[in-house]
Amino acid sequence: PIATRKASQICLDHFCADLPELIGGSADLTGSNNTFSKHNTELTPDNPSGSHIYYGVREFGMVTIMNGMSLHGGIRPYGGTFLVFMDYARNAVRLSAMMSLPNIYVFTHDSIGLGEDGPTHQPIEHLVTLRATPNLYNWRPADLKETAVAWKESILSKSPSCLILSRQGLPQVKMSEDKISNISKGGYLVQKDEDAELNIISSGSELQLAIQAAKDLDQSGIKVNVVSMPCLDRFLEADLEYQNKVIQKDLPSIVVEAAHPNSWYKILGRDDLVIGMTTFGESAPAKMLFEEFGFTAGNIVSKAKKLLNK
């Protein structure tokens, strides 16, 4: 298993080798955000050509400085902090979207999956806030492959992007080349069954639970389509033909995401279901929290059977 914050660092090691215009940094969380690549050197008074900035505990200052670098041109800044601390940088993030500055925000520790730091550090409403921001793309990858595509698309983007990354290790999703090619569309079918009775849609760390639930439901004779949605913003820009190909509209849907559910209702029907977070978290190991808040394959199976009246 690889945490997507670590997967992000692996990607940085590749991209920074060929793109010297990438200037990184973190708001005093470099070791946790994994924003320092093996090609970076520290920017200091003695090394003004360094490519990594230690911004200190000042998220707003970090993003305003990134905005300035983007406005100058010739530089592609990326900066990291915990997702929950995005609140401190919110105004500057909003301005970057308003000005179409292609900053890359590395927001790690993306859910209750961060564990014992507790509710002060566990983001709940933050993904909804970011997804509601015009001209801002939010990628929540499930594994190394999705993280690599998220980085590539963020680098190619003319708008700012957020990489929403896990603290905890995640399994790698097995997929064919054609599925990998669809990641950039924001949402795609990880598993399709011609006899499907249900869509299960997920992102990030919960995708593994959706895949396991689909296997368990198959044992009960219930066929399922599994959809990975690393970037809802990008998916909603796709034509309706593609959207309806990915999310079969004549089937009920369940979304599984350890965040506030409000982002999802624009693609769901009235009777569809979101397994999400509508309260603040708790301080406990990640596995215990996922069980407490219903993020288990068993709970998805139970909800699916109830939704299908089986």
Residue ranges: model-predicted function:
Residues 1-310:
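Thiamine diphosphate
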